[in-house]
Structures are given as C-alpha cells and as structure tokens.
C-alpha cells in the first residue's frame, strides 16, 4: 500500500480501579509548562459497542476534562480502547508514556457511575493518538513499550498494569485511512457493516482491517480473554476436519462445534494463489447442515478444484470469527494433459522428439521424473495456471518404448502417466507427411497422430492414419481458453462454489463476447454447455435477472443462431445431435426469469424477439401478442385460462419469445403420431411462459396463428423428455385448426412450452366422409355377424353331422365371435379419451389388436384342417385332439403377439396412433398386426392352390365319402372367396401407410375392412349348402334358393320367425358341440 503520511497508532492502557470515583480531576502543570488545551472540557462519547447493555448505559455520559501534556502538532482525538483504573484522578505525563521522539496526545475518562462505592471496579477507556515520522517507529515501539516506573508508586497515583498497541493506521495518497487491528484486537461487527474491508494480507482475521475516509477511524476492541497461560483470545468454536489430505472422489466433512450462540454462519474456500475466498452454498456437490451448537459442511467427489483453505465465518460475542483448515487434493490421471498421447516416429527422419505432461495449479508441489531418461534432457515451465514438465529425447530408441512421466509430491504415491512411442520400421505402411493446414509427420498405419492447439486454445488435434496408409479426417477438440475457464466457473457454481445472485450476471455479461469469438465446433458446444449450466443454476436457486443480464443472454443467443451452419453447427451436431435442444432449454429457462420490477420489457434482434408483460389481479381481457415476422405470428391466451392463476392478488408475468432458425437446428426426432417422416417448418419457434410469483405454470390454453402455410399442418411442441432426455417434437395436447376462409395455420394447445408447426405434404386425409363410412360399415358388419350367430343358433345340429363340418363351423363360429367383439370395441373407441395415459384407450387398442388377430388365426386353423384332409385322405381326426390345438392357435398365438407389441412399443411412445385408440402406423406397432394377417392370407392361398389341384384329380372321388367330400368343398369355396377379399383389404391397408398415396385406396380399404362381417355372413355361412337346406326346411317351405341373393331374401323371413322359433324351445348348440370355441 502506498502511503502519503506516516503511520498512526492507538494505545490502550489497563488499570484496576479501587475507591470512590469523583467528578473532577486535578489539573497540574506539566514539567514542560504546557497547560491542557482549552475546548476539551466536555466531549460526548458513544457507548463501547460489543459490551453488555448495562455498561453501555453507564458510560454514555459527558466526562470532565483531564490535564494532558500536549505536543504542539496534534489536536485530534480518535476513539481508544479500554483500561482498568485504580484512582478517581488520572494524570499521564510524557514520561509515563515512555517519551520518545514521537509526539502524543492522550485523553482519559468516562464519568464513572456515582453509585459505585469503595472496593468496586469500573471500566474506563483511555485513548492515545500517536503519529510517527516513518514506518520504522511502530515496530520499535512494540519492542520497547514498557510500564513507566512512576506508575508503580502508591496511591493516590494510579497503578498502571498494562500498556498495549491496538490499531495501526496508514494513509494513502487519496486520503483514505487503512486501519488494521493488531494481535488480540478486532473491529466490532457493527462497524464492519458500515465500512469496507482492506485488501490486505490479514487473511485469517475477520474484520481486522477497515478503510475510513475520516481521520478518526475509531478503535479496535479487545477480544474475549482465553487461557491465562497462552494469553490468546477465547475462540467460541472448534473446527474439525476428517482429513487434510482428500483423495480424488472422496467426500470432505468439516464440522464446527460452537460453545457460544453464533449468527451469520458462512463457509468459504480460498483457492491456492487466490486473493479472496469463494462463498460455498448448497449445490450438486456441496451440502450444508446446522443444528443446535453444531454446523457441518460436506463436499462430495473431491478434485483439485476443491483444494485450498476452508473457512468457517460466524459472529459471536459481538465479534466476527474465522476458523480455517487447509485441504490438499492430489491430482488424478485425467487431470494431466499429455502431448502426445502416442507417437509413431521414423528414426531416419526424426532422430529426436519431445514429450510433455502438464498439470493445473494446485497447493501441492509436484516434481516429475521421466523414465527411461537416458540420452534425454528434462525441464519444466509454468504458463497460464498450469505447470508443464518436458522431456527432450535426443536419441531415437531402437524399438517401441513406453515413456512414463512420474509426478511426485511429498507424502503421496507417484502418479504415472504413460506415453507410448512406436518406431516405424522398414516396410511398414505409413501415411506421408502432410503440411496442408497443420504439420502432420510421417505416421504408422493404424496410429493416431496428434498436434497441439493454436495459442490461447486448450485441447488437442487428432488425425487417424488408416490401415491403407491414407490420412483420415482431422478431429479437433481445441477450445478457447477463456471460454473453457468460463465453463469451469459455471460448472463449479452449480456444484456450490460462489453466490448465484452475484456470479450469474457476471457470467451472462461474458457470453456475447464469447459467442462472437467462437470459431470451432468445440467452442460452440462449450458455449452451449455453459448456457445450460447457467440455466440450471437460475432454476435451482430461483434467482431473478435484471434487464442487462437478460439482454446479454438474448444477444448471445442471437449470435449462436447466426453461426455458420455448415462449418460449426453441422460438425457440432455430429458430436452431439441434441445441441439445439440444449440451447432451447437454456433460453426457455432464462427468458422467464426477469425481475417483476423490470416489466414491461421488449427486445428485438434479427433472430430473437422477446416481449414480457406484468399483469395485476384484475386484467381486463385476453392476453394477445403479435410479432412482425415472416410469416406473421400471433398468439392469444383466453382470460378464463389465466383467471385461476391470479388468486389472492398474485401478479403474473407472461413472457413470449420467438426464435428464428432454431427449428432447423433441432434434431429430427418425432414423437408418437408423427412417425419418421420428414417435415418442412416455417422457421419459427414460439416460447410462452407464465410466472405467478416465483412459480412457473405449464398448463394453459393458448391459440397461435403461424401465418400462411403450404401443406397439411401439424401443431407440435418440443418435448425435452422424449428420446432419453434429448428432446423431440410431440403433438400431445395440440391440434391444428385450418381456417376455411384463409390459408393460415392455427394451433390450439393446452400447455405452455416451445411451439412450432410442421408441414407434411402427404398426410392421411381427415375427411368426414371417411369417418361416416367407417361407422356405417362397422354397423353393417356387426348386424351381419349377429345374423350369422342367429343362423347357427337355428341350424347347428343339422350342419355338424361329420367331423370335417364340425371343425369348419367351429372355426367359423369363433371367427364370428372374435370379429363381433373387435368391431364393437373399435366402434366405441372414438368415444374414449385418446392417448397413452388413458387406461381405457390402451385397453381398447389392445383388445382390438388381439381380437382382429384371433379372427385371422381361426381362419388359419380352418385352412390347416383342410390341408390335412387333402394330404392325408384316409387319416381320421379326433375331436379331443384337434379342438385344443385349434384353440391354442386361435387364441394363444394372437394373445402373445398383442402382448409383445404392447410391451415393446408402449415404452417408446410408439404404440398408439396420435388422437386414436388404435395401433400407430408410423412407429411400427401396426406392422405387428398387418404382418401376421398377410402371412396367414399367404398360407391360405397355398392351401387353396393345393385344394384346386386335388379337385382336378379323378382319384379324389375314391377318397372320403360323398358327405365329407361335400364338406371339404364347402371349406374350399369359403376360403376361395374370403382369402382374396381379406388379402386385397390388407394389401390396401399397407398402401395407405405410404406418404404419396391418393385418397382412393383409403376409401376402398375402409369399405372392405368395415364389411368383413358381411362377407363372412354371405360367403362363410349362407353359401354353405347344408345351411341353405336346413333354413329352407325350417322356414321357407319352398324350393331351394338358386342363389345367395334369393337365400338372403329368404333369410329376411328367418329373422321375422326367429322369435317364434326361440319360443318353441329350439336348442342352441351345446358346449360339447362347439368344443371350447365359445371361449
């Protein structure tokens, strides 16, 4: 410190006082003949801060003048320290003060309590102000200061028992007083709150040095006395450390045991070489706990970033106390930077080479020992916070060698860092020397060459030499040193080092400059990571940003969005495809953290537009906002959606942020209902957030207009929880509303987040005619299936007189049951709440999948029975063996397929189609239904081909009896008609999954799919000759119908007679007849 004046000392004396106090002191003339200065007869003195209340009341009174010999050059009276006096009259002379070449001025006295009697003690303050010509006097005075002989005389003179220096003040060239307390003394806490501390070397003494602007700075107080043997102050606490040497990954534990009541407890860490400590607060690595008489600090996952001096600062007994412990943390292998990691070299072209290992600065002293060291020269140097050890190998080794850099520190095991050297031999495949951008030496095939980063950058540049001797691409991890330091600072802030309220604005102030200087993918990724950690700190600490801090964020965001896509973003996304999602999440979090007093706030940049408003409890109408973008963007939040948020007089802030170009930087991840298609975007992302107090709300109805659109719009939002936290577009809670009068795309969403609109040129048409056609077709199918059940009710015993007929009709009856249940479930599914979170919707989709599959598996069972009878003509089938197999095939197989599909696709969010209770056609779930169906149709086609060949053989008539042969012909006829129909239906179903298909296949598929029950009734039931004969004999009483159409007209009479027949007790087929088909 540069001083423009000589130092100044304050002197305290200590005397015991016995006897009755008096109100006036004597005024003798000094030996020099100088009388006391006039004007010092009375002076008002404040209480001694830090003592008990009774003492403060006692001394806050005027006091009488005291005769003090004065030097002609001093006339200022600073406050002093305390003393114990023996008599009521105190006179100090220059001889009693140990007269020297210094001038002095002293004053004594407080009006003692008149109630004190003889033998009582009172505390009296005596102050001495000494000026010295230079700095050599205070140390000399401290060594020679002794009690004067005159003070040992008997009463009435006082008995002076102590004389000690308390405060040393120095004045700089600006006239400021730097006053530091000497050993055993300290400024009171109330004074510390009003004056700034010195930037001095008083590291471990809290409130030990203050800066004053006036020449009467006050005085330092005597700390509470401790042990009479040590004469040290009594510290009201003990700090315990589990170990001063913490290994990497350990957990540090500091415990403070307090003997007095303490307040304002804080923990600090001073890094090696740092002038000021860092506040420690709860974070990802720091935890702070306190209980009665005890406080604890815990730091997990220790590393060299946590080495240094830990301090516990608190207030007790009117003073500030600092207790500290020094913690050492050894380095680990990942903390050491090696250059190179490996090296392949040709001794013919490079007789020597250089190796280095660099370590960060730490409070441990490290030395390096290289091995092998023959023919080499070791050295070291320091640069920008790191220490590097270099080995210059002057002779190339004859064979492959592994060099080791052994880092050693006293009391620690050596840390070995290996560097492998490969010698290129004659005949080895090598990559040639390349000096296009960086210098790449000759490298052996299969090895990685390394080069240092340019100046002011950290990292390394790598390049692989391929097995064929061709250089691969250059991979650089070079990152700007200042940006890397900012990232480390932000990460440590989240861990618990520093005050977020102070650190976050400072970090945000540096982001625009760092964004402007980012020149590599590593710079971009480090910048995005820094913004991510800042956002996490703001969210966890719930701090608010002022306008300047938010502007810095938006400026940095604008520069990041404006970075070159080809040279920076594409390469950065190749390493981390979710880099754009990281930026979006950080900006979302920070943009809504503006202080309420800074509203309203608007800010506009080429790629960033923000508007934030504050609303009181009684806002008049809907919230609406518009942005002058191309196309224009508008948003509206209805008043009824905001009303529940402003209860109890709460103010709400609504922040709307528009980001350009960001949607092109987000990964092409599409959630449920969007599939893997590529969508076009209008280039805008809208972020809306609502804050009520310190709470953020994510639910609320918002209506957005994204302007003119081409194609079919999909209203989406960016869901950060999709794809293992990497984010993706989702349609959940959003729906598109295309206005008929204008081509604009309107979106209605039930939550608040980052919105956009995706344009698909080819989408499934959402026409009312298709929905109506589906409902009508399913109704007709259900009605036809009920008619089919009624027919079997009437003619079951007639048509199952042989085993072939029994197997065929049992399979057909189970097909009817399954298809009837599936169609009913599918028809009722639209009335359920769609989405994977709806149990009823999930159940409906699972049942439809299972029942539709079961329908086709029973058709397969029917075809397999036919194939067996055609191949093994004289082999008879037993009911008790065939029926269980048919049941297993018809129900167990489709149940297994449906269960596997549910377990496989539901966790991935690709089970249900968006907005429907049916399988997703884009994610792959629908293929687990269409695939088995087409496979069964293919098997049925093979069986039919085999049956046609058998029918053409004349020997077929020599096989089974005529009745069985007729039954086989019925099976063949049904399969011959139903298989092509079902095959065509689901072939068209696959075609509808294509993006560029027209609307015609959708209509044909809907008609054929919904009328499956009608086809089964006509071609599986009514075309059977046995059934026709049974129905004619029972109801028609006429000639047999010549066609299916006439049979249908006949069946209309059947329906009218059904109630009459049932009343006559016509039996329904028993469970023995149907086997287990009813289940």
UniProtKB/Swiss-Prot annotation:
Signal peptide residues on this chain, from the entry's feature table: 1-25
Parts of the chain on the Cytoplasmic side: 797-811, 875-881, 950-973, 1024-1079
SMART domains listed in its UniProt record: GPS
Transmembrane annotation, as ranges: 776-796, 812-832, 852-874, 882-902, 929-949, 974-994, 1003-1023
One Pfam family per UniProt: HRM
A single Gene Ontology CC term: membrane
Residue ranges that the UniProt entry lists as topological domain Extracellular: 26-775, 833-851, 903-928, 995-1002
Site positions for Cleavage: 752-753
Residues of the GAIN-B domain: 599-765
Annotated stretches, region: GPS: 715-765
Subcellular location: Membrane
Disulfide bonds: 715-747, 734-749
GO biological process, one term: adenylate cyclase-activating G protein-coupled receptor signaling pathway
Glycosylation sites noted in the Swiss-Prot or TrEMBL record: 188, 264, 301, 382, 441, 648
Membrane topology listed for this record: Multi-pass membrane protein
GO molecular function: G protein-coupled receptor activity
Post-translational modification remark: Autoproteolytically processed at the GPS region of the GAIN-B domain; this cleavage modulates receptor activity.
Keywords, sorted A to Z: Disulfide bond, G-protein coupled receptor, Glycoprotein, Membrane, Receptor, Signal, Transducer, Transmembrane, Transmembrane helix
Family listed: Belongs to the G-protein coupled receptor 2 family. Adhesion G-protein coupled receptor (ADGR) subfamily.
Function noted in UniProt: Orphan receptor.
Subunit comment: Heterodimer of 2 chains generated by proteolytic processing; the large extracellular N-terminal fragment and the membrane-bound C-terminal fragment predominantly remain associated and non-covalently linked.
PANTHER family for this protein: ADHESION G-PROTEIN COUPLED RECEPTOR F3, IG-LIKE DOMAIN-CONTAINING PROTEIN
Name of the featured protein: Adhesion G-protein coupled receptor F3
């Amino acid at each position: 410190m540069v001083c423009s004046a000589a130092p100044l000392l304050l002197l305290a004396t200590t005397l015991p006082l016995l006897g009755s106090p008096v109100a006036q002191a004597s005024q003798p003339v000094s030996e020099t003949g100088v009388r006391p200065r006039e004007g010092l007869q009375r002076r008002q003195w404040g209480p001694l801060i830090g003592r008990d209340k009774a003492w403060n009341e006692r001394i806050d009174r005027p006091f009488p003048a005291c005769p003090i010999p004065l030097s002609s050059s001093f006339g200022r009276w600073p406050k002093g320290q305390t003393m114990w006096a023996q008599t009521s009259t105190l006179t100090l002379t220059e001889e009693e003060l140990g007269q020297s070449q210094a001038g002095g001025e002293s004053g004594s006295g407080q009006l003692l309590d008149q109630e004190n009697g003889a033998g009582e003690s009172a505390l009296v303050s005596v102050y001495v102000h000494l000026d010295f010509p230079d700095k050599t006097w205070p140390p000399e005075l401290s060594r020679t200061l002794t009690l004067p002989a005159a003070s040992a005389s008997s009463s009435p003179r006082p008995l002076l028992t102590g004389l000690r220096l308390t405060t040393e003040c120095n004045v700089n060239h600006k006239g400021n007083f730097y006053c530091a307390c000497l050993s055993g003394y300290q400024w009171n806490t109330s004074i510390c709150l009003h004056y700034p501390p010195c930037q001095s070397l008083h590291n471990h003494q809290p409130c030990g040095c203050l800066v004053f602007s006036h020449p009467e700075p006050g005085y330092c107080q005597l700390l509470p006395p401790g042990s009479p043997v040590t004469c040290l102050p009594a510290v009201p606490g003990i700090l315990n450390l589990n170990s001063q040497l913490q290994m990497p990954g350990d957990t540090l534990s500091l415990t403070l045991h307090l003997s007095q009541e303490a307040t304002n407890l804080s923990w600090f860490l001073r890094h090696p070489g740092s002038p000021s400590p860092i506040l420690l607060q709860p974070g990802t690595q720091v935890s702070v706990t306190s209980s009665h008489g005890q406080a604890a600090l815990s730091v997990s996952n220790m590393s060299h970033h946590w080495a240094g001096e830990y301090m516990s600062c608190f207030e007790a007994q009117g003073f500030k106390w600092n207790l500290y412990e020094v913690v050492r943390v050894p380095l680990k292998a990942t903390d050491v930077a090696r250059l190179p990691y490996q090296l392949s070299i040709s001794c013919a072209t490079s007789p020597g080479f250089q190796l280095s290992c660099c370590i960060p600065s730490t409070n441990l002293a490290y030395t390096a020992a290289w091995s092998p060291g023959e023919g080499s020269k070791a050295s070291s140097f320091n640069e920008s916070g790191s220490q590097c050890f270099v080995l210059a190998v002057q002779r190339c080794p004859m064979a492959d060698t592994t060099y080791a850099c052994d880092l050693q520190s006293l009391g620690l095991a050596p840390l070995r860092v290996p560097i492998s050297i490969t010698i290129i031999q004659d005949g080895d495949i090598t990559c040639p020397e390349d000096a296009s951008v960086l210098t790449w030496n000759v490298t052996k095939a299969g090895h990685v060459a390394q080069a240092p980063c340019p100046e002011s950058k950290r990292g390394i540049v790598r390049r692989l030499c391929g097995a064929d001797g061709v250089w691969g691409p250059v991979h650089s991890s070079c990152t700007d040193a200042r940006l890397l330091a900012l990232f480390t600072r932000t990460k440590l802030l989240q861990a618990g080092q520093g005050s977020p309220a102070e650190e976050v604005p400072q970090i945000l102030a540096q982001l625009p400059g760092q964004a402007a200087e980012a020149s590599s993918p590593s710079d971009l990724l480090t910048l995005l990571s820094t913004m991510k950690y800042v956002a996490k700190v703001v969210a966890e600490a719930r701090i608010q940003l002022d306008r300047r801090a938010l502007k810095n964020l938006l400026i940095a965001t604008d520069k990041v969005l404006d970075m070159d896509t080809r040279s920076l973003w594409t390469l950065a996304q190749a390493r981390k495809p979710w880099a754009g999602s990281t930026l979006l999440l950080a900006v979302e979090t920070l943009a809504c953290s503006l202080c309420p007093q800074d509203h309203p706030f608007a800010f506009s940049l080429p790629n960033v537009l923000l508007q934030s408003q504050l609303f009181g409890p009684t806002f008049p109408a809907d919230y609406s906002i518009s942005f002058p973008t191309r196309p224009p963007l508008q948003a509206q939040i209805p008043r009824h959606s905001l009303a529940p948020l402003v209860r109890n007089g709460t103010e709400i802030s609504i922040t709307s942020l528009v980001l350009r170009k960001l949607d092109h930087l987000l990964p092409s991840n599409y959630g449920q209902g969007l599939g893997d298609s590529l969508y076009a975007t209008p280039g805008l992302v809208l972020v809306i957030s609502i804050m009520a107090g310190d709470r953020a709300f994510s639910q609320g109805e918002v209506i957005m207009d994204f302007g003119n659109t081409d194609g079919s719009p999909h209203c989406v939002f960016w869901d950060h929880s999709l794809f293992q936290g990497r984010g993706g577009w989702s349609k959940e809670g959003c729906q598109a509303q295309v206005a008929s009068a204008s081509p604009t795309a309107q979106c209605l969403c039930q939550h608040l987040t980052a919105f956009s609109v995706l344009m698909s040129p080819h989408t499934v048409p959402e026409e009312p005619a298709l929905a109506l056609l589906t409902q009508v077709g399913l109704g007709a199918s259900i009605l036809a299936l009920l008619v089919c059940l009624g027919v079997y009710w009437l003619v079951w015993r007639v048509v199952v007189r042989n085993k072939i007929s029994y197997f065929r009709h049992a399979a057909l009856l189970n097909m009817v049951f399954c298809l009837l249940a599936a169609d009913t479930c599918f028809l009722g599914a639209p009335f359920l709440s769609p989405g994977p979170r709806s149990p009823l919707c999930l159940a409906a989709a699972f049942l439809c999948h299972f029942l539709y599959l079961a329908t086709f598996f029973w058709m397969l069972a029917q075809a397999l029975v036919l194939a067996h009878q055609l191949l093994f003509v004289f082999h008879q089938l037993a009911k008790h063996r065939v029926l269980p197999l048919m049941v297993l095939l018809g129900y167990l197989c489709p149940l297994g397929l449906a269960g596997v599909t549910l377990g496989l696709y539901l966790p991935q969010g690709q089970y249900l189609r968006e907005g429907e209770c049916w399988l997703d056609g884009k994610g792959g779930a629908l293929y687990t239904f269409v695939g088995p169906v087409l496979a069964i149709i293919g098997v049925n086609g093979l069986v039919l081909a085999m049956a046609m060949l058998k029918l053409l053989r004349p020997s077929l008539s020599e096989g089974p009896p005529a009745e069985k042969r007729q039954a086989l012909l019925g099976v063949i006829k049904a399969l011959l008609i139903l298989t092509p129909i079902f095959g065509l239906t689901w072939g068209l179903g696959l075609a509808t999954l294509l993006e560029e298909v027209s609307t015609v296949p959708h209509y044909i598929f809907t008609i054929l799919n919904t009328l499956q029950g009608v086809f089964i009734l006509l071609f599986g039931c009514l075309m059977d000759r046995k059934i026709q004969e049974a129905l004619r004999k029972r109801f028609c009483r006429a000639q047999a119908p010549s066609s299916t159409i006439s049979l249908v007209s006949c069946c209309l009479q059947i329906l009218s007679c059904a109630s009459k027949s049932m009343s006559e007790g016509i039996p329904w087929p028993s469970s023995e007849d149907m086997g287990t088909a009813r289940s």
